[in-house]
Amino acid sequence: MSRFNPSPVSLSVTLGLMFSASAFAQDATKTDETMVVTAAGYAQVIQNAPASISVISREDLESRYYRDVTDALKSVPGVTVTGGGDTTDISIRGMGSNYTLILVDGKRQTSRQTRPNSDGPGIEQGWLPPLQAIERIEVIRGPMSTLYGSDAIGGVINIITRKDQQQWSGNVQLSTVVQENRASGDEQSANFFVTGPLSDALSLQVYGQTTQRDEDEIEHGYGDKSLRSLTSKLNYQLNPDHQLQLEAGVSAQDRENNVGKSAQSSGCRGTCSNTDNQYRRNHVAVSHQGDWQGVGQSDTYLQYEENTNKSREMSIDNTVFKSTLVAPIGEHMLSFGVEGKHESLEDKTSNKISSRTHISNTQWAGFIEDEWALAEQFRLTFGGRLDHDKNYGSHFSPRVYGVWNLDPLWTVKGGVSTGFRAPQLREVTPDWGQVSGGGNIYGNPDLQPETSINKELSLMYSTGSGLAASLTAFHNDFKDKITRVACPANICTAGPNQWGATPTYRVNIDEAETYGAEATLSLPITESVELSSSYTYTHSEQKSGNFAGRPLLQLPKHLFNANLSWQTTDRLNSWANLNYRGKEMQPEGGASNDDFIAPSYTFIDTGVTYALTDTATIKAAVYNLFDQEVNYAEYGYVEDGRRYWLGLDIAF
């Protein structure tokens, strides 16, 4: 690999992909009437949504190759993809992945408690629907616990799937990735989406995917990864105002790292060995959407998910019930509802201080929000949520947010919102102790939720015909952070572990703050060429504890993304993308953290999409065009070098 040395072949590919056709292009101008549902629980124009929100459209997703959702999120302001290789995760506004809530059609999903200690980054994204099933991705930056409860401290990612059609239709995508460096593993994938009516009132939807990534012959590189999923939905239209849906799905992830290939071959505690991890997720859900004439619209669901880490004999069953009613009352749009969650963890391997293998917990919550149209151009949203947990008691999460449409072009947004994360099951269980190289970790029943208060102000400009810009400033106070400290001998009686490390337990002690700015620009250069870009500045600092003065996470302060799209002809679209990741901040500290600072890097990708027919489209791209090297010695993770992608989409 080279540091950044564009070869003649690379430059030829760039020019060929970006300027491979010449003709007057069709009008690419579009109106900015993007609708979102995550910010308030009902559909509204994005400019009026009471939150900082970004949308990745289906068109954006279709134009190129994404390994998973993390790749698609790299262009979203405020979002940082942490780690590398097949252990990436998502940070929003400087908060760790544990503080990002992931939803699919508004339904929460998480399997993190099947992966204690390291949390197994890179797994959560594998449970998400395949590309062909996704209509759009909505990303809220900042806390949203008033509507969504625990975990929504950093932000919320909501995957919106495609709706049923009145006639049978579908899509299939086949793709392959070929690495220029033959020590890196190639990848093959296929995903599909099919929907259609079974009768006048009953419709069916089925989607799934299979992906195989070969193992690198690079130490600390990508392991062998196999991903498979299948989901089916039945929709029954009871009458014009009420609909029932039954959903069921199965997913599997198998990951293997071998010594001599991607697994560490030296410096291990004891003998370095191969790893073989098998994760499974099964889920079933029933939901109802109703239009109660003269009252409002309701959305109710009951979901059960079973997540299993077969390799470590761990499983967690999550049962969630949520019901929301949105009711217009004069100048008010009132949203209120209830939510309940039951967690049941079975872990036969990680507890080393007692015979206990099962933990469970139940949470209930009530919430209410009101969007009040105080004037024709000004709306004020305020609300609160009361959660009750049998472990820590009750917690209240308020928020207030204003949206002011200065005129048809300018909008000002701002407000104060709160978030919290409830302690995980192992963290609050007194007779539970996990093995850790930095000291065995004991549970603490006195833990309270981690909390945050976010303040933000945004200025948005949009012509409605393609030109749009925004600037957002935010400040987040993070309190009661759960951290590990030395455990008193009268509580942790076992003493040092086999590595000589003294026992630890978790307490609410640390405080931190994050602040920064986010900017976006979309600019139609001509009728056929459009530029879009985003910039993120993030600063974080721990205000207390052993690592006061250090950042909350080891993240870059500066991120920049730019994308150029050219609708070359009616059938041909060319694009190029630049992604800059700045030098990382100082390490956040801790026994398991590397004490070095990863330098900056820039990736440039380019590709084309060509419609062979009305139903068949071929796509090609070169990723990491200039073969920028990101290796373990300098960065702490490995990224792929130059690689070539070829995809075929078929619609029917």
From Swiss-Prot:
One of its GO terms (cellular component) is cell outer membrane. A motif (TonB box) lies at residues 33-40. GO terms for molecular function: siderophore uptake transmembrane transporter activity. The keyword Membrane applies. Residues 45-162 form the TBDR plug domain. Residues 1-25 form the signal peptide. Residues 167-652 form the TBDR beta-barrel domain. CDD domains: ligand_gated_channel. The keyword Transport applies. It is found in: Cell outer membrane. It is a multi-pass membrane protein. Keywords: Cell outer membrane, Ion transport, Iron, Iron transport, Membrane, Receptor, Signal, TonB box, Transmembrane, Transmembrane beta strand, Transport, Virulence. Pfam families: Plug (PF07715), TonB_dep_Rec_b-barrel (PF00593). Its main location: membrane. It comes from the Bacteria. A motif (TonB C-terminal box) lies at residues 635-652. Regulation of the irgA expression is negatively regulated at the transcriptional level by iron. Belongs to the TonB-dependent receptor family. Involved in the initial step of iron uptake by binding ferric vibriobactin, an iron chelatin siderophore that allows V.cholerae to extract iron from the environment. This is Iron-regulated outer membrane virulence protein. The gene is irgA.
